[in-house]
Amino acid sequence: MKKEQLLDFINKYHLGGKIESAVWTFDNDEITTKFRSGDKGFMGIVTKKNFGFAENCQLGVLTTGQLVRLLSVLGSEFDFGLNKQTANDEEKIVSITISNEGARINFMLADLTVIPKAKGLKNEPDYDLSVTIDDEFIDLFVKSKAALPETKSFTLLKNKKTNKYEIVIGYSTTNSNCIYIPVEVSSLVDDADIDKPISFSSEYFKEILAANKGAEEFKFTVSYKGISHTSIKNGDYIMDYYLAEVQTDI
């Protein structure tokens, strides 16, 4: 197995350390993970086809950051194996072994019951607006977030003077340091319009953008009901990330 491939998969859910725990599901050479934040304000699904691991199983990865650090010890390619134990006539995968000629790593897995469950949205709403996302926007958003690191949210609103949409980092109802980024918005339903600002986590959105820059297909849609959906396709990857509306920064 190539280390670059495994790390690329991890990066798309680990999101700079925002998500530590996830269940990896291997099924017919496809790997999928569903995950959510502790406050349940963010969840996602990452799937990669043609992963190159044939055994169907589920692995509970409790400390993804630790696994990433362990992988740094190895070179560009390694063997990936499962270690199993039997108790009460039940076979369980308890750890994985990752090895090459230089070193061998044993990484302990967690029971699946201790990993936060992310089953998906119970009632996914219809989306009202679609925002154009490209690499230029990604670069600008990431730089803007770095310039205002204390800002926890970004806001989609319509500028009353220009009648055009903007994404604002640092938005507040009072005067504040903020960055306005003009965006192209299209309506997904007739006469869709946002009559008030709607905000989502800039912490997670920044990491989503950074982890998926250069993707072939990138869609960001927003529902008045307080949900945003970032849908990304790139080669063998399909990613879906959902954010719940948050309060704007004070």
What are the functions of these language-model segments?
Residues 1-107, 127-250:
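DNA polymerase processivity clamps
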Residues 105-121:
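Short, well-ordered, aromatic-rich surface patches in folded extracellular/luminal domains
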